[in-house]
From Swiss-Prot:
Keywords: Acetylcholine receptor inhibiting toxin, Disulfide bond, Ion channel impairing toxin, Neurotoxin, Postsynaptic neurotoxin, Secreted, Toxin. One of its GO terms (cellular component) is extracellular region. Belongs to the three-finger toxin family. Short-chain subfamily. Type I alpha-neurotoxin sub-subfamily. Residues 1-20 are annotated as: Disordered. This is Alpha-elapitoxin-Nn2a. GO terms for molecular function: acetylcholine receptor inhibitor activity; ion channel regulator activity; toxin activity. It is found in: Secreted. Signal peptide: none annotated.
Length: 62
């Protein structure tokens, strides 16, 4: 599985997920800097107030 791993609005980059990982994620939240977006492999548990989108196809998390 190939997932995007760039932060916020940086130039898109991808990573090959290891260990049979089947999910990519994108999570985002807002603070004094604006909206922060984090992407990567897996489907993490997030705290209240953080939006999370998990998906299961290559490069689906941009």
């Amino acid at each position: 599985l190939e997932c995007h791993n760039q932060q916020s609005s940086q130039t898109p980059t991808t990573t090959d997920c290891s260990g049979g990982e089947t999910n990519c994620y994108k999570k985002w939240w807002s603070d004094h800097r604006g909206t922060i977006i984090e992407r990567g492999c897996g489907c993490p548990t997030v705290k209240k107030g953080i939006e999370l989108n998990c998906c299961t196809t290559d490069r689906c998390n941009n």
